[in-house]
Swiss-Prot record:
It comes from Finegoldia magna (strain ATCC 29328 / DSM 20472 / WAL 2508). SUPFAM superfamilies: Ribosomal protein L6 (SSF56053). One of its GO terms (cellular component) is cytosolic large ribosomal subunit. Keywords: Ribonucleoprotein, Ribosomal protein, RNA-binding, rRNA-binding. Part of the 50S ribosomal subunit. This is Large ribosomal subunit protein uL6. The keyword Ribosomal protein applies. The lineage of its organism: Bacteria, Bacillati, Bacillota, Tissierellia, Tissierellales. InterPro entries: Ribosomal_uL6-like (IPR000702), Ribosomal_uL6-like_a/b-dom_sf (IPR036789), Ribosomal_uL6_a/b-dom (IPR020040), Ribosomal_uL6_bac-type (IPR019906), Ribosomal_uL6_CS (IPR002358).
Length: 179
């Protein structure tokens, strides 16, 4: 039984939700507009200021899609009202980030600098040389872009050098001891 799927979603003021017959969900809000194709098996109803998601049968696939669909719609509504952001911390001697127009320039200890173009719908701020703030209205895009940047130089367990999320804790290891 999907407990998450059974919860109705309240539509806040200033947000407009439309669902077509083939479950194409469009959410417009103060921060922008998101369009996403939901699973066709699910039944999505928009009534007054609430959205309910129900499943046609009790087979395993429908049960698993039930909570997923409800969460996807909820994330779209939250994205167009509040937005999402991830903060990355860069640690290490000589490791730093800078912004040049729409390009992010990273010095991560390699022999070359790494330049990344900001994807559509995502903004990257560099308040300090060692901090990146990635924000946007699509939760999946923000998370994917943050993960790609983190993968350029993941944190290592001995000195903690690399790129990590702000709320991430790195388990440190003890180095080898001399004789």
């Amino acid at each position: 039984m999907s407990r998450i799927g059974l919860k109705p979603i309240e539509i806040p003021n200033g947000v407009e939700v439309k669902v077509t017959e083939d479950n194409l969900c469009t959410v417009k809000g103060p921060k922008g507009e998101l369009v996403e194709q939901m699973p066709k098996e699910m039944i999505i109803k928009v009534e007054d200021n609430t959205i309910t998601v129900s499943r046609p049968s009790e087979i395993k696939r429908h049960k698993s899609l039930h909570g997923l669909t409800r969460t996807l719609v909820f994330n779209m509504i939250e994205g167009v009202t509040e937005g999402y952001k991830k903060t990355l911390i860069i640690e290490g001697t000589g490791y730093r980030a800078a912004k040049q127009g729409k390009k992010l320039v990273l010095n991560l200890g390699y022999s070359h600098t790494i330049e990344k173009e900001d994807p559509e719908g995502i903004s990257v701020e560099v308040p300090e040389q060692h901090t990146l703030i990635i924000s946007g209205i699509n939760k999946q895009q923000v998370g994917n872009y943050a993960a790609k940047i983190r993968d350029l130089r993941g944190p290592e367990p001995y000195k903690g050098k690399g790129i990590r999320y702000e709320d991430e804790h790195i388990r440190r290891k003890v180095g080898k001891t001399g004789k």
